[in-house]
Regions:
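N-terminal hydrophobic targeting/anchoring segments and the immediately downstream early-domain regions
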Residues: 1-172, 225-402
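Histidine-centered catalytic micro-motifs
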Residues: 19-26, 197, 215-219
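Distinct, well-ordered alpha-helical segments
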Residues: 136-140, 201-211
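Short, contiguous, pocket-lining structural segments
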Residues: 170-177, 193-201, 230
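Alpha-helix-loop-beta-strand connector modules within alpha/beta enzyme cores
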Residues: 171-187, 205-215, 345-348
């Protein structure tokens, strides 16, 4: 199959089975760059100079559903984290209201499917980091009522009740309150997202959950040994759980040679006063200056396909998906430059012999199914369980984690 033929097949497949992407940081990029002023950054226009995402490129990429991250910095704690998360939610709702012919809010699997049938991109929300609930199950429920349909248990730092993959162990997984968070998420129908969490947290969550979990943007640790990726024993546990691991495109998570380069680049950014996750024009300019002096190892669509090949082998075709992390990273793989690029990845997988039925599961069906399954579990649990009023002090004590 020629590259051109594969790309044509990929586009045709995505017209029938569009991508549901697990993680896009457009709301935070809009906060950082224009203070949520959508007049200053109109995504109905070409925003390629500033963003990975705009409406035309979402359409070109065959995106039918997007989990918009309502991420806030881990430095935000308590009330500040909660209010900033609500501001992020408000941004997603404002985008849907401003572009109703393109974006449609979706809170359920049925609403996701209905949005696609109406020719719109289903817009769902995921909160990225347990700091967004400020150790409060009532706040967790409030975020659910506002439309949040997954919670990533941690971001890059630990929370008092769960360990992150990129922080020093403190709880050795989940505390008793962390288990209660997972169980209350199950009762609500909010997906438990295990991207960013430590392997012991992954394993504790899989033991605690009554519903399928997701990894909204994580790849294979066996292919690239970065702590943000998923160990094989956890991937192998997904069929029994029913969960879905959504492979990410972040170069330092998919290409071993990019790990050390990224560490050095982040150190240079820190010296100049930038946060490692800063994607403002000033931070990007500093990064590009470093890249000019120290050439960057370049991932490609084939690099990501290597991860998906391995994840399919270990977890099975019913338990994988895609979570690009666009607008949350400074660099993307060659050929996966922005949200218009999903056809390039699908074309690469077609050339490797993936069937159209398998690709339809990867792009669309697995994500719809995991959301629908979580909703079914919640309906059953709500017949017998009341909202939890447990507190972290009651379950973990005044001295913190177990």
């Amino acid at each position: 199959m020629t590259d051109t033929a594969a790309l044509e097949r990929a586009r045709a497949l995505l017209a029938e089975h569009p991508v549901i992407d697990g993680h896009n940081d457009l709301p935070w990029a809009l906060r950082e760059n224009v203070g949520y002023d959508l007049d200053r950054c109109d995504i109905s226009q070409d925003q390629s100079a500033l963003l990975h995402t705009d409406l035309a490129r979402l359409r070109a990429g065959g995106v039918g559903g997007q989990f918009w991250s309502v991420y806030v910095k881990a430095e935000f704690q308590g009330d500040k984290a909660v209010s900033a998360t609500i501001e992020q939610i408000d941004c997603v709702r404002a985008l849907a209201a401003r572009y109703p012919e393109h974006l449609q809010l979706a809170n359920t699997a049925d609403e996701l499917v209905a949005a696609r049938a109406a020719g719109r991109i289903a817009s769902l929300m995921g909160a990225e980091g347990g700091h967004s609930i400020a150790c409060s199950l009532a706040t967790l429920r409030a975020l659910y009522e506002l439309g949040v349909r997954y919670l990533t248990l941690t971001h890059n730092d630990n929370v008092p009740w769960a360990d992150s993959a990129t922080d020093e162990p403190a709880a050795n997984g989940l505390t008793r309150f962390g288990v209660e968070v997972v169980r209350e998420m199950n009762r609500l129908g909010m997906l438990v997202d295990l991207s960013h969490v430590a392997p012991d947290t992954m394993r504790d969550a899989l033991r605690a959950t009554r519903a399928p979990v997701i990894f909204s943007h994580s790849s294979s640790r066996a292919v690239c040994d970065h702590p943000r990726n998923i160990p094989d024993d956890v991937l192998a546990a997904l069929p029994a759980n029913g969960g879905v691991a959504m492979a990410t495109f972040v170069p330092k998570f998919v290409l071993p040679a990019a790990i050390e380069w990224s560490k050095q680049a982040e150190a240079v950014l820190a010296e100049r006063g930038f946060h490692p996750l800063d994607t403002t024009p000033e931070a990007l300019e500093a990064l590009r200056a470093y890249e000019d002096a120290t050439p960057r190892p370049v991932a490609t669509a084939a690099t990501v396909a290597d991860h998906l090949d391995h994840m399919r082998e270990v977890a099975g075709i019913d338990h994988i998906g895609i979570g690009g992390d666009y607008d949350g990273v400074a660099f993307t793989p060659r050929g996966l430059d922005d949200v218009a690029s999903y056809p390039n990845l699908i074309a690469e997988l077609l050339t490797r012999g993936w069937s159209e039925a398998d690709l339809a599961k990867l792009t669309w069906h697995n994500a719809v199914r995991v959301l629908r399954d979580a909703e079914a579990v919640a309906r059953d649990l709500q017949r017998t369980e009341r909202p939890s009023i447990a507190t972290i002090e009651q379950l973990d004590g005044a001295d913190g984690p177990r």
